[in-house]
Swiss-Prot record:
Gene3D superfamilies: Leucine Dehydrogenase, chain A, domain 1, NAD(P)-binding Rossmann-like Domain. PROSITE patterns: THF_DHG_CYH_2 (PS00767). It catalyses: (6R)-5,10-methylene-5,6,7,8-tetrahydrofolate + NADP(+) = (6R)-5,10-methenyltetrahydrofolate + NADPH; (6R)-5,10-methenyltetrahydrofolate + H2O = (6R)-10-formyltetrahydrofolate + H(+). This is Bifunctional protein FolD. It comes from Hamiltonella defensa subsp. Acyrthosiphon pisum (strain 5AT). Homodimer. GO terms for biological process: L-histidine biosynthetic process; methionine biosynthetic process; purine nucleotide biosynthetic process; tetrahydrofolate interconversion.
């Protein structure tokens, strides 16, 4: 068996085209383009690259993007003040605080300062709670991107045994809620999980988000499974790999996402979808 590749890059481009069409439709109606504000604290090079990529994507679809680079010395009060200012700005539809924040910040508390209807990352407790209650509003971008990717390939997860490896607030936990909503029998594996191999071998749909290169051996993959690899890990030789041992996994799975070019582009595409949605619901 040789797995079919789920090309997140091409699907993300489809979504960008759809969002751009939505923006043009608004402009023809005399309405303004969506506005996204991105807050970046400090000089983290990886975060700077992520922010630049997000702003580029925004410009490609016709959004108005605003970047607020703040020094490493920024206080909690200063960050809260900026978020409150953006909450009240009628031209801003989405507010994104680039993570990770410096260690002295309580990230969860900072994200709670964002108005739920402008929380285009989907991390606010209100939006997570809405997803849990089966009335999703603004959905976390990576899980939303994964669900969109499955849908675009006509892969219906309803009834599948799904395993999410990793229980972060950004991916693992909201991913489990998305899969429950889609009708999966969902298991979440984490650092205390015993007999991980058995769980993986039983999974019809496997989502891995732990940030460890080739953490899941390809030989564990259930024949015919759908494998979604969220990990992005740069090796010492400069090669970028996922959390799943790709080559072996691809001989057993029916479908698999590559790294890079799988989930990553879908996350950015979901951010664009959320921002357009937030704008349309406000104006």
């Amino acid at each position: 068996m040789s797995a079919k590749i789920m090309d997140g890059k091409s699907i993300a481009q489809q979504i960008k085209n759809e969002v751009a069409h939505g923006v043009q439709k608004r402009l023809k109606q005399g309405k303004r383009a969506p506005g996204l504000a991105v807050i970046l604290i400090g000089e983290n090079s990886a975060s700077q690259i992520y922010v630049a990529n997000k702003r580029k994507a925004c410009e490609e679809v016709g959004f108005v993007s605003h970047c607020y680079p703040l020094p490493e010395t920024t206080s909690k009060a200063e960050l809260v003040s900026l978020i409150k200012q953006l909450n009240q700005d009628p031209e801003i539809d989405g507010i994104l605080v680039q993570l990770p924040l410096p260690e002295r910040f309580d990230s969860a508390n900072m994200l709670e300062q964002i108005r739920p209807d402008k929380d285009v990352d989907g991390f606010h407790p209100y939006n997570i709670g809405s997803l849990c209650q089966r009335i999703p509003k603004l959905r976390p971008c990576t899980p939303l991107g994964i669900m969109t990717l499955l849908a675009r390939y006509d892969l219906d997860p309803c009834g599948l045994n799904a395993l999410v490896v990793g229980a972060s607030n950004i991916v693992g936990r909201p991913m489990s809620l998305e899969l429950l909503l889609a009708g999966c029998t969902t298991t979440v594996a984490h650092r205390f999980t015993q007999h991980l191999q058995q769980h993986v071998e039983n999974a019809d749909l496997l989502v891995v988000a732990v940030g460890k290169p080739s953490f899941i051996p390809g030989t564990w993959i259930k024949p015919g499974a759908i494998v979604i690899d969220v990990g992005i890990n740069r090796l010492q030789n400069g090669r970028v790999v996922g959390d799943v041992e790709f080559d072996m996994a691809a001989t057993r799975a029916a479908w698999i996402t590559p790294v890079p070019g799988g989930v990553g582009p879908m996350t950015v595409a979901s951010l664009l979808q959320n921002t357009l949605k937030a704008c349309m619901e406000r104006t």
